[in-house]
Amino acid sequence: MSIRSGFLSLSLVAALWPAAPAPAADAIGIALEGFAYPHAVAFLPLTQEGEELRMAYMDVPPGANANGRTALLLHGRNFPASYWEPVVKALRETGYRVVVPDQIGFGKSSKPTFAYSLDTMARNTAALLDKLGVGKVDVVGHSMGGMLAVRFTRSYPERVDRLALEAPIGLEDYRFYVPPVETERLIEQERNLTADAYRRQLISNYAIKMPPERIEPFVRIREDVKDSGEYPRWLRSFVNSYQTIYSQPVVHEIPLVSRPTLFIMGGDDKNAPGRPFAPAELRPKMGQNAKLAQDLAAKMPAGRAEIFEGIGHLVHMEAEQRFNETLLGFLNEGR
């Protein structure tokens, strides 16, 4: 099924962000022009590899009772920063200022075609906090954002109070299972992925426990950018992020994180990037994420893991109330 309308209906946006206004009826560009975010979006100018870039972010003020703390939310590979809205709302209500960036290559940020680095992403994030005058933060990272959260905490430990990792990938070194895959092969595979195939991929790979309509905006974004004249740039940028995940493991440094750390894992989440490229006999060994999180937490100075049984990869959307209660309980410990 090919979806090429170039528009997002109000019902689809509301499925993700109930309080968001209807988006303008514009085509979706590769920086998600025409796709509404639930809060005002600003941009940090950056120069990398000779390219002038813009890093998009939402800087959401606290509610009525500010607690003087700031939360930094780091998105996953397949999701725009706007999917954090249920968590933003819960944090604001308890007094947090919330900073929610789209990393370079994602969401409303620029889409360069050069290779990505977790170290560069961490530096960009630190530069954003500097611009906003933010010192210490509580960091929450989901999926690929969990890998970045680990690298950010290791690179800037003085800037992190607490670290929450929601269904992070990178809890194993995928190079031990998956051979290198050429970028051009990945581009061709992604180009040929239909909306129906991507929808099935999300549901199966992420073991999502939500009504299908709640993941439809993710499918629509991915499909609608195909109508952009800059789609080849988006495609190469997206594929480059797989190579980052594959080639820059963080599992070996997770036990070295000294900040209080909470893994929040879906018990059914067996997501493992690159699994289809692994030898058949190795695939079942990959993606035992809940167990991997428990084992890693036990090796950390101040780590622990909470497993949400019957939940998949999108924990903060599949189990919204429980996730928010667990996260806030962790962030407020001893405060």
Language model features: what each stretch is:
Residues 290-335:
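Catalytic active-site module of serine/aspartate enzymes centered on a nucleophile-bearing elbow/loop
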Residues 119-137:
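Conserved acidic catalytic loop of the alpha/beta-hydrolase fold
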Residues 44, 227-298:
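Conserved serine/cysteine hydrolase catalytic core
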